Design a protein with these regions (language model features):
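Amphipathic alpha-helical repeat scaffolds of TPR domains
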Residues: 56-76, 101-123, 149-169, 194-210, ...
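N-terminal leader/linker segments that initiate helical-solenoid repeat arrays
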Residues: 9, 14-119, 124
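Canonical positions in the second alpha-helix
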Residues: 95, 137, 144, 188, ...
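Terminal, low-structured helical/coil segments at or just beyond the last alpha-helical repeat
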Residues: 237-278
Length: 278
């Protein structure tokens, strides 16, 4: 997998950041060979303040902490230096520790923040530091499960960093823990069939690897299309970016370069500095 983590309406007529050519306002047609489904739009940005799709910030969390969370998230996607990301995260975690929010919400926020820092270190090729932060994210998610049980939110919060660790650590860890990522996503979907984060975890597991490692690019695109149909109220910026890049990657793996380029350009409208989408 490739890792694949301020509220304005998406303007479909923005100039593509890669070549400054005006992007067509609607996605290119999905070829019949890929499936009968179509992408009618690139999706919208949510107007709500959410930690994850459909999960708002806890009421006791003060506005400066919410603002700092979004700054941290966006800096990760803008490929800021991991040292600056880590410093910002440490400061934010300290800020959150004294705010009147539940232990479960503390654990959720710690898991998400730690995941973002791990992602930043991983993007900058520091495997050791990435592992440290992904492990912290897993520990926080496990604490969340201990406090509230295996809720869909807790399961996807655990599955995402565990998936990263399964790639970064040794083969034994992958064999033991890799299958759990899909299992946790499936379990989340059992009680919440429209859980967007769980669906995206499923789609990513199909969009990025080669077929020998479970890649199924047509199925991935079908899941991504279903997410867009569910997310009528929009998605957080990072989630929408990951979705667009996932669609682009699946099309790229199918050698459909026109479709892939359109979706990469759509992703760059959200984070023009992101190196993967360029």
């Amino acid at each position: 997998l490739i890792n694949i983590s301020a509220f304005v309406t998406v303007n479909n007529m923005l100039y593509a950041q890669t070549n400054y050519v005006l992007r067509e306002p609607s996605p290119p047609q999905n070829p019949a060979s890929v499936g009968k489904f179509q992408f009618s739009s690139p999706g919208l940005l949510s107007q709500s303040q959410e930690i994850l799709p459909g999960i708002p910030f806890p009421k006791g969390m003060m506005l400066p902490a919410v603002t700092t969370f979004f700054e941290l998230r966006d800096n990760v996607y803008k490929s800021a230096t991991p040292e600056s990301i880590e410093a910002q995260a440490v400061s934010l975690l300290k800020m959150l520790s004294i705010q009147p929010i539940s232990g479960s919400n503390q654990a959720l926020l710690e898991a998400r923040i730690s995941y973002l820092v791990g992602r930043s270190w991983n993007d900058h090729k520091d495997k050791k530091k990435a592992i440290t932060w992904f492990e912290r994210a897993v520990e926080a998610a496990q604490k969340m499960i201990g406090l509230e049980g295996e809720t869909p939110t807790a399961l996807v919060t655990l599955a995402e960093p565990l998936g990263e660790l399964s790639i970064l650590k040794d083969l034994g860890f992958l064999i033991k823990n890799g299958p759990k990522v899909g299992q946790y996503a499936s379990k989340a979907l059992e009680s919440d069939p429209k859980n967007i984060k769980a669906l995206l975890l499923k789609a990513s597991a199909l969009a990025y690897p080669p077929p020998i490692w479970g890649g199924d690019y047509k199925k991935a695109l079908e899941i991504y299309a279903s997410v867009l149909s569910i997310a009528q109220n929009g998605l957080p910026r990072d989630v929408l970016f990951d979705l667009r890049v996932g669609i682009a990657t699946a099309y790229s793996n199918l050698k459909l370069s026109e479709n892939a380029a359109w979706w990469f350009d759509a992703a760059l409208e959200l984070y023009p500095e992101n190196p993967y989408a360029k």
